[in-house]
């Protein structure tokens, strides 16, 4: 006689806990085995990336590097160095300032290329603007005629230099510069006696193509100092340090006498301005706004 399986209370037959767990385990194994099997299947070879077109966009640093090397092949009197800075690209990171300090082994307080900051607007509509300010390398530099020993002068290529061996530290040129682009080096050593001495105390600088060891008494200690467009790098066919480290690609450099150079192209834009043009200094640093 067959066993009667109907329950008198009307409920369906129950499922044991062991049977339920076994069924769940089988389902989980099936779910996992699908992706594993797919992953184990041999992948097809990726399609090769298309070749970059030869006439594609050129890296601006490479273009400016070529501009510099082309200019250096000319006599010094036939080139005219200039810089353009796109203020729309500047993010105020001060990478250019730090690169300049590292390149020229500058002590605290001697800054060739600060990034000036300005807050504009009213709360809550406030924004900040940044303006890198190197030496303007003026065509009519007011710092030159005030030097009593002719230690500062304009080279044929437009760079305004300081002859450290002739400078007497009178600082007349610092007062005469309307851009605040010159600072005095008092020869201080700020980390003497500390565990970590700074680079400017232990490593020589190579400004103007010479080696300057810092001892607190000899040049450039006691001299006026300023940006010189990294002339020692230019003479080696390299761009200024501030140009190569700009995060936003906001700084451009080259020969204004070369119509093929990038800086010549940018300086002719309608949105270009120069600082304090009303003074007649004719700065060679152009700002795109």
Language-model features, listed with the residues they occupy:
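N-terminal secretory signal peptides and thylakoid transit peptides that target proteins
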Residues: 3-28
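Twin-arginine (Tat) signal peptide motif
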Residues: 12-21, 39, 43-47, 96, ...
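C-terminal segment of N-terminal export signals and the immediately downstream linker at the start
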Residues: 14, 34-83, 278-280, 286-289
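Non-heme iron-sulfur electron-transfer modules
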Residues: 49-55, 59-63, 102-131, 153-166, ...
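Mature N-terminal segment immediately following signal peptide/propeptide cleavage
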Residues: 75-98
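Short cysteine clusters
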Residues: 90-96, 100, 135-138, 143, ...
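Short functional micro-motifs and their immediate structural scaffolds
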Residues: 95-101, 105-108, 143, 152, ...
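Long, compositionally biased charged/polar accessory segments in the mid-to-C-terminal portions
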Residues: 232-289
